[in-house]
């Protein structure tokens, strides 16, 4: 089959699947580099090269922002892949804006086209741009790249890196120092200040306490009692609530049931007595029979 005869939906599906694979691979590669960079920063902190570690952390922050961008672009590709048939029905930019502002298709297409210049490791995005230029028009693609038309602000920020704030760099350095157990001057200062605050909290006793609760007795109350503790018994301990395991043996049995139980026991005793009498009579008869048999033999 000639390339020109391949349907647009098949081209778009193939391109999006390739973009997803490349974006995932780029994320994994970038994460491995970031992990190695953190170890290098920890080594610099260990050798007291904090200024050099500071600059390395700035690069590390830019790498993390780039990884976030790759993750967002992957989600956009997944969204478009799930809605290829819907995209196939789009023919103009006006239709794209009018019908697909709320379902995410307009945002995803513009973001992927705009990010082409900032994601060099995914060449398949340029193929996606060409497909969109063929489907809608070239002016649409050029307007997105040059004028940022309807491109989300979060994508523009992640594609235009700036110098990170000092607080963010310090936070990264502190976390790396904690993770790899290496010294960092600002981390030690923060730990010493927090420990001094804790010690001051414990060293300042409140002057309002006059009585010593340790000398006062402890009062044990029933669990169902609503009595509150008084001044003599500031500490109260509730007894365990009665349940099937700790219930007392002193149960009140109704009179009717009690009568039936007593009568039943008495009848059982009588039957046992009757049985014993009958057994005795049978034993005596057996003995007499044995004696008569013995006399006959003689």
Swiss-Prot record:
Region Interaction with VPS4, residue ranges: 251-298
Any GO CC annotation of this UniProt entry: cytoplasm
Phosphoprotein is among the record's keywords: no
UniProt feature, compositional bias: Low complexity: 190-206
GO biological process, any: protein localization
Major place of residence: cytoplasm
Protein keywords: Cytoplasm, Endosome, Protein transport, Transport
Region (Disordered): 190-283
Record motif MIT-interacting motif, residues: 286-296
Stretches with biased composition (Basic and acidic residues): 247-270
InterPro entries on file: Ist1, IST1-like
Keyword Nucleotide-binding found: no
Subcellular location: Cytoplasm; Endosome
Gene Ontology MF annotations: ATPase inhibitor activity
Similarity annotation: Belongs to the IST1 family.
Assembly, per entry: Interacts with DID2. Interacts with VPS4 (via MIT domain); the interaction prevents VPS4 oligomerization, competes with the binding of VTA1 to VSP4 and diminishes the ATPase activity of VSP4.
Other remarks on this protein: Present with 4760 molecules/cell in log phase SD medium.
Protein name as annotated: Vacuolar protein sorting-associated protein IST1
Species for this entry: Saccharomyces cerevisiae (strain ATCC 204508 / S288c) (Baker's yeast)
Lineage: Eukaryota, Fungi, Dikarya, Ascomycota, Saccharomycotina
Gene name linked to the record: IST1
């Amino acid at each position: 089959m000639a390339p020109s005869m391949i349907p647009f939906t098949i081209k778009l599906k193939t391109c999006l699947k390739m973009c997803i694979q490349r974006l995932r691979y780029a994320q994994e590669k970038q994460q491995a580099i970031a992990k190695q960079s953190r170890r290098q920063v920890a080594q610099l902190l260990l050798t007291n090269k904090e200024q050099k570690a500071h600059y390395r952390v700035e690069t590390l922050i830019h790498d993390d922002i780039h990884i976030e961008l790759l993750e967002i672009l992957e989600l956009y590709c997944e969204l478009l892949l799930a809605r290829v048939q819907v995209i196939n029905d789009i023919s103009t930019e006006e239709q794209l804006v009018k019908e697909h502002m709320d379902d995410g298709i307009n945002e995803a297409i513009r973001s992927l086209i705009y990010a082409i210049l900032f994601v060099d490791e995914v060449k398949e995005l340029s193929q996606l741009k060409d497909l969109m230029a063929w489907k809608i028009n070239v002016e649409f693609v050029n307007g997105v790249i040059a004028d940022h038309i309807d491109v989300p602000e979060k994508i523009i920020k992640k594609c235009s890196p700036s110098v990170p704030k000092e607080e963010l760099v310090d936070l990264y350095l502190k976390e790396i120092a904690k993770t790899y157990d290496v010294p960092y001057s600002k981390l030690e200062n923060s730990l010493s200040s927090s420990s001094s605050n804790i010690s001051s909290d414990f060293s300042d006793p409140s002057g309002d306490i006059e009585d010593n609760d340790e000398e006062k007795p402890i009062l044990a109350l029933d669990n169902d009692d609503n009595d509150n503790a008084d001044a003599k018994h500031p500490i109260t301990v509730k007894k365990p609530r009665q349940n099937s395991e700790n219930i007392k043996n002193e149960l009140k049995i109704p009179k009717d049931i009690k009568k039936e139980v007593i009568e039943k026991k008495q009848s059982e005793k009588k039957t046992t007595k009757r049985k014993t009498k009958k057994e005795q009579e049978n034993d005596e008869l057996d003995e007499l029979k044995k004696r008569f048999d013995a006399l006959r033999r003689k």
